[in-house]
A protein has these predicted regions:
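Intrinsically disordered, low-structural-confidence terminal and linker regions
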Residues: 1-25
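Charge-rich, low-complexity terminal tails
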Residues: 2-4, 256, 268
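Interfaces and regulatory segments of ATP-dependent nucleotide/adenylate/phosphodiester-chemistry enzymes
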Residues: 28-240
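Hydrophobic/aromatic-lined pockets within catalytic cores
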Residues: 210, 214, 248-249, 267-274
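A short, surface-exposed helix-loop junction/capping segment
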Residues: 235-251
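Extended, H/D-rich, highly charged conserved domains that either
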Residues: 250-260
Length: 341
């Protein structure tokens, strides 16, 4: 018998079995929730009632938010999903991904493929499922609307019929989903397989949504107006430098503000065509940059998509002992033979 070369789903009257290439088959039994599923659902509700998602949004609103367990590829995957949102499509699937990552962050044992769960014998349910529509309407959509992260109907994105078919969420899910379907499936698979950190993925997605929110854009526009007025007032560069230094020294997030300041100076050099290559954007948050192949906070690469770093600056503020920092840079340089101090 030839080896299977594609995924497939076997549907029985009381269960479904998902076969994926390179993975063990998983059977999802239908029926009323098990005691373990009830316990997980209760904990999820309790944590959401306590403001779990709002706490994550507030955490991601801070300049020093840390996201340490995502690779560059994982970040790009989430970026593609967020960037796919338009006025017409993409919002429901992003909302669903936020819901899935939230559930998995609270209860790692909960499958995020099984979107229905009930004790009602007349309703379709998986024994290890979870009622995502209920959780969405009560805890996810209201919070996303409150913070302006997604423009959603008040009834919730799970009211979309295409997300409510009685099949597990997988690459074999039959309904026509508008938006970043392939990215959603990949994220779902990675999380379920234990290859994608759900909490850090949630925080990264929230951070991306915050940066795209109308409120953030308005704040950015207002800031630029204030800046133009300040520059037109005739202030000299020494006063500007003093203002920046005072802001760094008095900020609650001095280390991060220092990084932003140095990168801002680099942007000015870049606009004047004084850099030898492409200036990489500053990371949205402070992360484990060694894992991502970075050397410093500010990096100039030979071309836009090149991994060849020709100049890097690692901003350090308030560090009295630099030996550990230098050893860390030494470790990073081992990954970049084209670079030297």
């Amino acid at each position: 018998m030839e080896k299977d070369i594609t995924d497939y789903l076997v549907v029985h009257p009381d269960q479904s079995t998902l076969y994926r290439v390179g993975e063990e088959p998983i059977t999802y039994a239908e029926g009323k929730l098990t005691d373990k599923a009830k316990t997980r659902y209760l904990n999820i509700r309790v944590q959401l009632e306590k403001g779990y998602l709002e706490d994550k949004i507030n955490e991601c609103s801070q300049p020093d938010v840390k996201i340490e367990n995502l690779s560059k590829e994982h970040m790009e995957l989430i970026d593609k999903m967020v960037d796919s949102i338009t006025s017409e499509v993409g919002r429901a699937i992003v909302g669903l991904t936020v819901l899935q990552l939230t559930l998995k962050s609270i209860e790692p044992a909960q499958s995020i493929r099984l979107h229905k769960g009930s004790n009602n014998s007349n309703a379709f349910s998986w024994q290890e499922g979870v009622p995502m529509r209920v959780l969405d309407k009560n805890f996810i959509t209201p919070v996303l609307r409150k913070y302006g992260l997604l423009k959603l109907n008040a009834d919730g994105f799970m009211m979309t019929r295409s997300l409510a078919e009685n099949y597990p969420y997988s690459g074999l899910y039959k309904a026509a989903i508008r938006g970043a379907r392939s990215e959603w499936i990949e994220i779902t698979n990675l999380v379920e397989d234990g290859h994608l950190h759900p909490e850090d993925s949630l925080k990264y997605m929230i951070s991306s949504l915050l940066n795209k929110s109308d409120e953030f854009q308005k704040l950015s526009d207002d800031t630029l107006v204030i800046l133009e007025k300040y520059l037109d007032s005739g202030v000299d560069y020494k006063a500007i430098l003093t203002l920046i230094q005072e802001f760094v020294e008095t900020s609650e997030y001095s280390a991060r503000i220092f990084e932003v300041s140095i990168h801002s100076f680099s942007q000015a050099l870049d606009e004047l065509k004084l850099l030898a290559g492409h200036l990489k954007p500053l990371s949205q948050m402070r992360s484990a940059n060694k894992k991502h192949g970075n050397i410093g906070d500010i990096e100039v690469t030979s071309t836009k998509n090149s991994l060849s770093i020709i100049e890097a600056w690692d901003a350090k503020y308030g560090k009295s002992y630099m030996r550990d920092e230098l050893e860390e840079i030494s470790d990073k340089l081992e990954l970049h033979v084209e670079t030297e101090i």
